[in-house]
């Protein structure tokens, strides 16, 4: 691989993904290629995204927020991955050496891709509905987000599922012929604002497609 192929810029889309991932885990192991993956330290949140850039090598970053804030000191920097132990960040006459972390100290997703079971329930979630749900959870101090299928519809409800008299905010997001309840902690909803196709499985629920 020549020097030019080891130098790249990060698009706004990729920077937004990395900022979102920093909210899940402030350390990241970027693997060679065009897919970013992260997992929370508690290993209860897993996220991945395809990006337009192609990373030329594995990159271990211990403090992702610090790395992103450092990039913010520049307008349009080039990232040179030629050095073995650091990223050379270049713009005009300015140079930064950002040293790689030891991959062993980073909580990273498993190498093996997750094989998901057959989809049980699908519904669309637009950015406005999600934004309102999260704002309502903050206003009413509600810890839980529930996807509930009943009476022919799918609705998302922010509530305190342990308190029958708690305030609730609900929005209908689809139709279904099934009865189900999937519960999340609001604090674990770490997704970039946008429209999603949400897919529910018997043992897990997660948004699977992000529409830019």
Regions of interest found by a model, annotated:
Residues 1-46, 50-89, 110-159, 167-201:
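DNA replication sliding-clamp ring fold and its partner-interaction surfaces
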Residues 85-109, 211:
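C-terminal interaction segments
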Residues 163:
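Extended substrate/cofactor- or partner-recognition/assembly subdomains adjacent to catalytic sites
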Residues 203-212:
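Single conserved hydrophobic/aromatic residue that forms the stacking wall/gate
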């Amino acid at each position: 691989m020549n020097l030019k192929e080891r130098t790249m810029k990060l698009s706004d889309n990729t920077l937004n993904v990395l900022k979102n991932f920093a909210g899940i885990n402030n350390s990241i192991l970027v693997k060679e290629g065009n897919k970013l993956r992260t997992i929370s330290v508690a290993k209860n949140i897993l996220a991945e995204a395809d990006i337009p850039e192609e990373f030329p090598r594995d990159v271990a970053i211990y403090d992702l927020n610090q790395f992103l804030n450092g990039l913010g000191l520049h307008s349009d920097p080039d990232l040179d991955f030629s050095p073995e132990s650091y990223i050379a960040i270049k713009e005009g006459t300015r140079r930064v050496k950002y040293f790689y972390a030891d991959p062993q100290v980073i909580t990273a997703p498993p190498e093996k891709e997750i094989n998901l079971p057959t989809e049980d329930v699908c519904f669309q979630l637009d950015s406005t509905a999600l934004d309102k749900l999260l704002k309502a959870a903050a206003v009413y101090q509600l810890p839980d987000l529930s996807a509930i299928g009943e009476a022919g519809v799918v609705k998302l409800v922010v509530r305190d599922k342990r308190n029958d008299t708690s305030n609730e905010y609900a929005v209908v997001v689809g139709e279904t012929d099934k009865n189900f309840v999937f519960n999340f902690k609001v604090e674990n909803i770490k997704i970039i604002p946008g429209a999603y196709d949400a897919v529910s499985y018997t043992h897990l629920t997660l948004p699977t497609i992000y529409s830019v």
